[in-house]
Amino acid sequence: MDTNSRNRLIKSASYLSVTTALIILSIKLYAWVVTDSQSILAALIDSMLDITSSFINLIALRFALQPPDHHHRFGYEKLQDLTIFSQSIFFFASAFFVGFSSVKSLFEKTKPENISDGTTVMYVCIFLTIILVFYQTYVIKKTGSEIVKADKLHYFTDLLTNVIVIISINLSDYFWFVDPLFGVVISLYIFHSSYSLFKKAFKNLVDHELPEQDRQKIISIVNNHLGAKGMHEMKTRYAGQKAFIQCHLEMDGNMSLYNAHKISDEIAFEILQEFPEAEIIIHQDPFGIEEHVKYREYIVR
């Protein structure tokens, strides 16, 4: 798939996400007003975060998908990480709010009202969310977009939340504590999901190295090329879903620059098969010169 087609698909998923979130938010607001249910309130807050996240994604995509320019020669991919990081903070705040409100209802022993209206509304929300999640899954399969993956997690969480809400408000007729208790459970789930997003985005923002298994793939590729005698100063990072890989490749010092360049290109090509669209910088060094070597990768010969 070419870049323009990929970008169009990602943007279409974001537009559909915002539209669906607006509709669901309006429906849940009505449901909460007529039922006064804590679990519906939790679902409403979750939807408010979904729509906030979707708007942030839409704005970020406007910039993150732009090609590198004169002032941003590494590109704009880190905007994706900044977006996901911001979303996780919103989620932390919402988890606290929902948890606090639900615990308060547990102490006050409140029960929801107009349960049949609330149930009908939640079924409509489930139907709309399923359509959106199916389309997002299709877009992810075609593009691998991290922003759409994060957005899908929000709405998949929303889908589970809606099912839980239907169960809780219908059980609350028999057990008063079920509705606020499910509100607490949902808040804990939101907190857990937030932490996963926060951790990944934070690692990318501070230029954390690629996972060790990915680093070993790179080392193995270099190790399998007979022209490489060693490697040092390997540095890796992610920005959005794009990998940045650089290293100093050690080769026979008597080799011509042309052959050294050819070997570097061959190794870069093999790395690209494992990390499509990665930006790779390979510096050629003569083997045996230890000056300025800070750390060396282990190469088997």
Swiss-Prot record:
Coiled coil location: none
Topological relation to the membrane, as annotated: Multi-pass membrane protein
Alphabetical UniProt keywords: Cell membrane, Membrane, Transmembrane, Transmembrane helix, Transport
GO MF annotation, one: ferrous iron transmembrane transporter activity
InterPro entries associated with the record: Cation_efflux, Cation_efflux_CTD, Cation_efflux_CTD_sf, Cation_efflux_TMD_sf, CDF_Transporter
Subcellular location per the Swiss-Prot or TrEMBL entry: Cell membrane
One of the GO biological process terms: intracellular zinc ion homeostasis
Highest taxon in the source lineage: Bacteria
GO cellular component: plasma membrane
Membrane-spanning ranges: 15-35, 40-60, 83-103, 120-140, 171-191
PANTHER family from the UniProt entry: CATION-EFFLUX PUMP FIEF, MITOCHONDRIAL METAL TRANSPORTER 1-RELATED
NCBIfam families reported for this sequence: CDF
Family in the record: Belongs to the cation diffusion facilitator (CDF) transporter (TC 2.A.4) family.
Protein's UniProt name: Protein p34
Originating species: Rickettsia rickettsii (strain Sheila Smith)
